[in-house]
């Protein structure tokens, strides 16, 4: 299958410039293309993964990727479809974020092998040395204010106000495309659908300043079956950095994907063939309660992002927590699996009677409730049911001398640290 058709079949093409010309270019030989990543945090998140994996698919098809990290544009801020001005960051902060993002991209693109090995570029390399006068004379004169204000991403900000700094962002992104075309013969840009206005600023600059044709592919902004923006868990971004979102948390995110989205996400976020995904779809629809599509999705993406060992660890944590086998997990694994649950500091030398402890830590509201929970068998210490009202936590209950896990009922976990 032609790479363009495969991208379409996987639901990865939202919009393109001249499709016929783009198809022809991809058929005739190796195309150099780029995707830009502005450092707005110290990590990329799941929302970035759609463009990253699309870039990788094109590389596997023989085309050459350039990964542009916006050391300059990250200092300015993209106004596209944002309600308010971004907070400006210091150069030291942005430089640190650039390094982090460059490291993450190397997990997905091949920067070492073959004539189409990926190349990392930073747009601070050309913007850092250009003077304001040169910027206006050599770049700005190719953009009319009318053209710039016609962009949907700008229109939405006109009423509330947009600074010249952010207004000029589209010119900077357009110039990125121009520089990469002149220096590396890059003729295609890939980005999110919210970037269409900025990306076509690049094709316009190429046409007017160099009389060349540039191509654009936008990938869709992914939403779930309810229309909710994809890539957040409990309102928080799902990061690619394991320190910010653990492999276990990412595993759980994919396991909790709705049935209506699971097969579609397999096409977007995995490298399984379309035939393999079709087989999974049939099995999944025959027995949706077994959650095969979610299990495969979690396995493939966690392995892709964090490696096979991290996936196995996340799976083991899931299975042991589900079975209540707390003692089968290390403290490191427990911290990963129970991140975000209520955590209480306990004095090691206190007389930690189970009833007193349940109340003082806030796990229950009263001694009466605590006694009822214990007597009814609803309280577990490190996976062991406790029904003795006189039970006192001892050193033996301190896992690796660091924490104790309390469970109330089937699912409510609490961590006591010493």
Swiss-Prot record:
Q: Which InterPro entries match?
A: aa-tRNA-synth_I_CS, aa-tRNA-synth_Ic, Rossmann-like_a/b/a_fold, S4_RNA-bd, S4_RNA-bd_sf, SYY-like_C, Tyr-tRNA-ligase, Tyr-tRNA-ligase_bac-type
GO cellular component, alphabetical, reads:
cytosol
Family annotation (CDD domains): S4, TyrRS_core
Q: Where is this motif: 'HIGH' region?
A: 39-48
Q: Where does the protein end up?
A: Cytoplasm
Gene Ontology terms, MF aspect: ATP binding; RNA binding; tyrosine-tRNA ligase activity
Location of the motif 'KMSKS' region? 229-233
Q: Where is the S4 RNA-binding domain?
A: 352-418
Task: Tell me where the transmembrane regions lie.
Answer: none
Report the superkingdom from the record. Answer: Bacteria
EC nos: 6.1.1.1
One example of a Gene Ontology biological process annotation: tyrosyl-tRNA aminoacylation
Reactions it catalyzes: tRNA(Tyr) + L-tyrosine + ATP = L-tyrosyl-tRNA(Tyr) + AMP + diphosphate + H(+)
Identify the Pfam families for this entry: SYY_C-terminal, tRNA-synt_1b
Keywords assigned: Aminoacyl-tRNA synthetase, ATP-binding, Cytoplasm, Ligase, Nucleotide-binding, Protein biosynthesis, RNA-binding
The first-level EC class reads ligase
What quaternary structure, including any partners, is listed in this protein's UniProt entry? Answer: Homodimer.
What this chain does, per the record? Answer: Catalyzes the attachment of tyrosine to tRNA(Tyr) in a two-step reaction: tyrosine is first activated by ATP to form Tyr-AMP and then transferred to the acceptor end of tRNA(Tyr).
Q: Which PANTHER family does this entry report, sorted A to Z?
A: TYROSINE--TRNA LIGASE, MITOCHONDRIAL (PTHR11766:SF0), TYROSYL-TRNA SYNTHETASE (PTHR11766)
Protein family: Belongs to the class-I aminoacyl-tRNA synthetase family. TyrS type 1 subfamily.
Protein name from the UniProt record: Tyrosine--tRNA ligase
What is the gene name?
tyrS
């Amino acid at each position: 299958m032609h790479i363009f058709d495969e991208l379409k079949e996987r639901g990865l093409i939202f919009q393109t410039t001249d499709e016929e010309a783009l198809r022809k270019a991809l058929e005739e030989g190796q195309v150099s293309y780029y995707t830009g990543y502005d450092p707005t945090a110290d990590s990329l998140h799941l929302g970035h993964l759609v463009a990253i994996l699309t870039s990788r698919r094109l590389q596997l098809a023989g085309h050459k990727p350039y990964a542009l990290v916006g050391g300059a544009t990250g200092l300015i801020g993209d106004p596209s479809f944002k309600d308010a001005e971004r907070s400006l960051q210091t150069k030291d902060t942005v430089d640190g974020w650039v390094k982090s993002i460059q490291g993450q991209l190397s997990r997905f693109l091949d920067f070492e092998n073959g004539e189409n090995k990926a190349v990392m570029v930073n747009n601070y390399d050309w913007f850092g040395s250009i003077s304001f006068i040169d910027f206006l004379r050599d770049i700005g004169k190719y953009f009319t204010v009318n053209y710039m204000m016609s962009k949907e991403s700008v229109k939405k900000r006109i009423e509330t106000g947009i600074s010249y700094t952010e207004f000029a962002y589209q010119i900077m992104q357009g110039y990125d495309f121009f520089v990469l075309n002149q220096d590396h013969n890059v003729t295609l840009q890939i980005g999110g659908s919210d970037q269409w206005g900025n990306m076509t600023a690049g094709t316009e600059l190429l046409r007017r300043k160099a009389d060349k044709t540039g191509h654009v592919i936008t990938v869709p902004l992914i939403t779930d079956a309810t229309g909710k923006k994809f890539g957040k868990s409990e309102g928080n971004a799902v990061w690619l950095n394991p320190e910010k979102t653990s492999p276990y948390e990412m595993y759980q995110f994919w396991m909790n994907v709705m049935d209506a989205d699971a097969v579609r996400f397999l096409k977007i976020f995995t490298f399984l063939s379309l035939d393999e995904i079709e087989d999974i779809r049939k099995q999944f629809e025959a027995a949706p309660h077994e959650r095969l599509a979610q299990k495969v999705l979690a396995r493939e993406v966690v392995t892709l992002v964090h490696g096979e060992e991290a996936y196995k660890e996340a799976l083991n944590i899931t299975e042991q927590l589900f079975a209540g086998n707390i003692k089968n997990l290390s403290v490191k694994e427990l911290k990963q699996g129970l991140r975000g649950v209520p955590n209480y500091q306990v004095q090691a030398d206190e007389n930690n009677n189970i009833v007193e402890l349940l109340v003082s830590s806030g796990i229950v509201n009263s001694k009466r409730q605590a006694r009822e929970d214990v007597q009814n068998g609803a309280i577990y210490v490190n996976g062991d049911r406790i029904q003795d009202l006189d039970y006192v936590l001892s050193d033996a209950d301190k896992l690796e001398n660091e924490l104790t896990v309390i469970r109330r009922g089937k699912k409510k976990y609490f961590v006591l640290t010493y």
